[in-house]
């Protein structure tokens, strides 16, 4: 399983997503409330998935995506308006309100992509 980092500005959002993932068998490596924390956590891991909101007190999701290690994929969970205005390639998005099964299926798809990439190396 991939390393998972969860980053949202509200701690309760982070905890709710962590609970959903833990109950579904995923291991969450770090929970963060700022972009800087998310990047530091990702840089300490070899690879994985960053599940992120769109706005933090210190940066926007585009900046986080730009500085994210290449071995990491990013899953943006945001309002439909935020997702429509995005101009970032290689970014997986889920619109709010989000259903639990959508999150789990998306993570499964992203993990499959990471696994395929590792096999090619």
Which residues does each predicted region cover?
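Conserved phosphotransfer microenvironments
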Residues: 14, 35-38, 48-69, 79-82
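The C-terminal output helix
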Residues: 108-121
